[in-house]
Amino acid sequence: KEGYPIGSFYGYKAVGIMSELDYKNALKDREVYLANGSKFPAGYTLQGPAVPSYALDDLSYGNTIWKDVSGDGVIDTNDKTILGNAYPDFTGGFSTSLSWKGFDLGASFTYSYGGEVINFQDYYLFNVEGSSNQYAIAADRYVSDTNPGRNNVPIATRISVTNQSLKLSSYYVEDASYFRCSNITLGYTLPK
């Protein structure tokens, strides 16, 4: 996006999973939206979460709720935002060594702080569009308010407007910070 650093991830921010009550309220919002010429009247307060399209019938509970960045009550390209950046804030490394009675121990460490990564493995293994396997956790997706699953995995759907699997979103962006021992050596010097 123009005006932002190179390496930024740009997409939708996931803020939750749509419950049955959210769904019913979004349907009420859709009636108002359609009755007013595909827009909301000035000053209208949403009953439910903003959704991708009030004109389509593909809305369902269990879908991802997206952040309405533009505040217009409809999720569209104006609601994409910067989700993170691939470049870390800083990186570094250090090494150390110890010796004692013929034994020596050396270790090297590297670290990176800040920066994000897109987990494309999750992108494919939560996706119902592909021909690959899925995570076992995906079987415990949201089904209903009485069976919400045990995780934050949205309902499985092949509908492109609501399918969170097809959108680059905060759902797949993870912190890339790390602290790692990159090398460790233990030695012993034989006496002469």
Explain the meaning of each model-derived region.
Residues 1-84:
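Conserved small-residue
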Residues 4-8, 58-61, 114-192:
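Extracytoplasmic gating/loop element in the C-terminal half of outer-membrane beta-barrel translocons
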Residues 13, 95-97, 185-189:
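Outer-membrane beta-barrel architecture
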Residues 74, 88, 177-178:
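Secondary-structure capping and boundary motifs in well-ordered enzyme cores
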Residues 78, 86-90, 98:
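Active-site beta-strand/loop architecture of penicillin-binding DD-peptidases
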Residues 81-85, 172-175:
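Outer-membrane beta-barrel domain signature
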Residues 99, 110-112:
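Outer-membrane beta-barrel pore domains and translocons
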Residues 102-106:
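Repeated loop/turn-to-beta-strand initiation elements of outer-membrane beta-barrel proteins
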